[in-house]
Amino acid sequence: MTIKISIDCMGGDHGPSVTIPAAISFVESEPDAELILVGLEETLLAELKKHKASEHPRLSIVNATEVVTMDDPLEIALRRKKDSSMRVAINLVKQGNADACVSAGNTGALMAISRYVLKTLPGVNRPAICSILPNQKDGPTYMLDLGANVDCEPQHLHQFALMGSALVSAMEGNPRPTVGLLNVGEEDIKGNEVVKQTAVLLRADHELGRLNFYGNVEGNDIFKGTTDIVVCDGFVGNVTLKASEGLGRFVKSVLTTEFKSSPLNMLGALIARGALKAISQRMNPSRYNGGSLLGLRGLVFKSHGGADAYGYQWAIKRAFDAAKYDVLTRISTKIADLMPQSAATPEDSAGAIPNATIEP
């Protein structure tokens, strides 16, 4: 079965210099993948020729005459740049010509255009960006929101928990994934009013058997693997994500410096080379690149804007796997079961522009 993924090749900090090599590497490693490269045709063709892949049978180009920059206001990206590579790539999903879309572009624009073109699933007020982080249990911790919604009300965090539960059930085959609410302490009295009110909603769902709510969790619980899912607003989630990425690079830098500081340390590094390589791979942020815009009527994945080709390839893989295992249908069914009485409010309608302005 061939899976078609549309790639917004112009998005991100590096554009085609990263997206094209990533696309080539992925399609060569995955025989069931077909990638649709969207962007300025001449630019994409030149990059493909540079990598001797202009005649690849599973790489095609769809021309788009405009580019959404990282600085474009939402209004311009959504209303004026109607032939942007981002919008064309998303439209391919809407039209059924692609099974999923990947972009490293402007987060706010990607969310706004995705909501406008694809609409949200029934019962979903706001989509959220969900991705995985590593934990001590050698498994994934799913975390949302990672930057789509800076300001949230309790009902939004409540829905994020339900959507995250649906995603993990579909991806991991776990019918009762545990949900933790990120807070400054485990006690019920801790946190701001939004978090406290969210906890009340989640406990009510837990008592009804609709959700497996663990309770409040702290930042260290993310990497301990205390719960399968960690829920927070997009501001907190994005800061947490960036801090963890920075810590990983810091630890790697310190280890490299120390092991090179003396002949004895260099010998120790040589002896521990296998273990150090494994640690480096587990802590490499690029391996966890690619967040799902959860809650849309189509599969859209957000790559980190500054990702290199290796990291972008992981984002493509996550989109490919989601399409391959029909995650959208499974999530839609699960959400319908979990949120039978939920309805979008007017201000959160599918075509509204969300308050997503930060870059995950």
From Swiss-Prot:
Superkingdom field: Bacteria
GO biological process: fatty acid biosynthetic process; phospholipid biosynthetic process
Keywords (A to Z) from UniProt: Cytoplasm, Lipid biosynthesis, Lipid metabolism, Phospholipid biosynthesis, Phospholipid metabolism, Transferase
GO molecular function: phosphate:acyl-[acyl carrier protein] acyltransferase activity
Family annotation (PANTHER family): FATTY ACID/PHOSPHOLIPID SYNTHESIS PROTEIN PLSX, PHOSPHATE ACYLTRANSFERASE
Catalytic activity, EC: 2.3.1.274
GN (gene name): plsX
Lineage, highest ranks first: Bacteria, Pseudomonadati, Pseudomonadota, Betaproteobacteria, Burkholderiales
Principal location listed in the UniProt entry: cytoplasm
A Gene Ontology cellular-component term: cytoplasm
Cross-referenced HAMAP family: PlsX
Presence of the UniProt keyword Thylakoid in the record: no
Pathway named in the protein's UniProt entry: Lipid metabolism; phospholipid metabolism
Subunit note: Homodimer. Probably interacts with PlsY.
Protein name per UniProt: Phosphate acyltransferase
Claim: Nuclease is one of the keywords in the record: no
